[in-house]
């Protein structure tokens, strides 16, 4: 087997990894580069993916974040693409929601119609490859690592993952049952520049929100609409503190995709609505939200937890609601509000303002958790991707395992 990191050896996001065995090619992820990444005017030209003979090629998608799936519309339509079933539904809902304002999102919605889906932990084959999708916890729902086998070699491709989420507890058990050990691990290293960081578990963050909603009557949370765990965490925090929970129609559709729909998730009370206390949809007329007297009287009495997004629609609504002592929460990466960052979002900064509480935890693993996972897999060597500091990664782990640092476009034969 041969591994090529076409992109992602020294940057976060936009990763493209290739596994090749006897002419068969399996690619993992094909997404957009993040703001601040070393952009190139030239599109990637990868034989078997973007051009050339595709008869022995396929693409696996780890999850629906744009830096992992966002460029699939540029790929030839005959290329087979595979992703999780619920991840496809969420990605399709997002693309359809934005299709009225963007040609690219219309193209994405059309491309997703032809994407194949796999079943968690159910092994499938493609040419010489045996593939087992392993559910991992991430800030995108229905995210996957892949156990990829060919010619008696086993590689574990972690994708983006963490061990401090709601669904992280069974990862070790799943690894032991479905993977055991791996010859090589290709792993994300997003947080390598914070090696000592201990990230707040999602369940603790939910408790922090419960305390905040108890103390504060009027609450507005800015969170990604596809961060399913955070949405449900906010929902349950609101219900437990007897605060009405409000989302718009799109956010409600996203939550409905997950709520009680799948036997894997429905066992968890987190992804089920409390009877008689479902999320409330904001009233909308045309493109504007409506805050009538009945609604304002109700929230004046009971308070509210409102999930907001940037933009005038939400800003106008908030101006109509009671706001004495209102607290805004930023529950996403704070780099979006940092004018010195390439990802700075002026529209979000305007909506959130200067007076807010930062309540967030990373969608990526800390280095201690990564060390634990690699120890369980007991590989011959590890290959870092999805990192802006591969040398720091090597310094952290080289005493325990050989670390193979590849440049973009460089391959390693196992």
Model-derived features: positions:
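His/Asp/Glu-rich metal-coordinating catalytic cores
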Residues: 2-60, 66-229, 233, 239-240, ...
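Cofactor-binding loop segments of dinucleotide-utilizing enzymes, especially the Rossmann-like FAD-
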Residues: 8, 30, 86, 250, ...
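A short acidic, often aromatic-flanked loop/helix-cap motif at beta-alpha or helix-coil junctions
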Residues: 11-12, 120-126, 139-140, 279, ...
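Short, polar loop motifs at secondary-structure junctions
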Residues: 65-67, 250-252, 311-314, 387-391
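Cap/insert and terminal regions of metallo-dependent hydrolase folds
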Residues: 165-250, 324-399
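Hard-cation-handling environments
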Residues: 194-322
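Charged, glycine-enriched surface loops/patches
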Residues: 397-414
């Amino acid at each position: 087997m041969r591994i090529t990191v076409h992109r992602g050896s020294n940057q976060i996001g936009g990763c493209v990894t290739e596994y090749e065995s006897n002419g068969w090619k399996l690619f993992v992820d094909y997404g957009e580069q993040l703001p601040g990444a070393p952009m190139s005017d030239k599109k990637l030209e990868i034989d078997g993916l973007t051009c050339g003979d595709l008869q022995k090629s396929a693409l696996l998608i780890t999850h629906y974040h744009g830096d992992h799936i966002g460029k699939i519309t540029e790929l030839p339509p005959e290329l087979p693409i595979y992703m999780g079933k619920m991840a496809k539904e969420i990605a399709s809902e997002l693309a359809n929601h934005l299709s009225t304002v963007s040609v690219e999102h219309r193209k994405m919605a059309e491309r997703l119609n032809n994407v194949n889906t796999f079943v968690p932990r159910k092994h499938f084959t493609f040419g010489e490859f045996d593939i087992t999708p392993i559910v991992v916890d991430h800030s995108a729902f229905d995210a996957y690592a892949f156990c990829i086998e060919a010619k008696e070699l086993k590689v574990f491709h972690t994708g983006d993952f963490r061990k401090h989420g709601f669904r992280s507890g069974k990862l070790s058990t799943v690894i032991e049952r479905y993977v055991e050990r791996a010859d090589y691990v290709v792993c994300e290293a997003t947080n390598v520049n914070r090696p000592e960081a201990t990230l707040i578990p999602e369940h603790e963050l939910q408790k922090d929100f419960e305390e905040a909603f108890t103390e504060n009557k009027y609450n507005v949370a800015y969170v990604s609409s596809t961060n399913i765990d955070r949405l449900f965490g906010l929902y349950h925090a609101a219900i437990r503190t007897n605060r009405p929970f409000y989302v718009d129609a799109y956010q409600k559709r996203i939550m409905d995709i997950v709520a009680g729909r799948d036997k894997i998730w429905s066992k968890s009370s987190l992804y089920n609505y409390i009877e008689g206390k479902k999320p409330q949809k904001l009233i909308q007329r045309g493109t504007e939200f409506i805050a009538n007297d009945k609604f304002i009287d109700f929230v004046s009495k009971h308070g509210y937890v409102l999930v907001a997004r940037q933009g005038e629609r939400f800003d106008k609504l908030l101006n109509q609601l009671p706001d004495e002592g209102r607290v805004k929460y930023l529950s996403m990466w704070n780099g979006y509000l940092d004018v010195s960052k390439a990802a700075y979002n002026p529209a979000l900064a305007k909506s959130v303002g200067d007076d807010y509480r930062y309540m967030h935890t990373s969608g990526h693993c800390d280095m201690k958790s990564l060390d634990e996972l690699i120890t369980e897999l007991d590989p011959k060597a590890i290959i870092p991707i999805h990192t802006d500091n591969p040398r720091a990664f090597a310094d952290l782990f080289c005493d325990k395992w050989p670390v193979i640092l590849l440049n973009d476009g460089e391959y390693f034969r196992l």
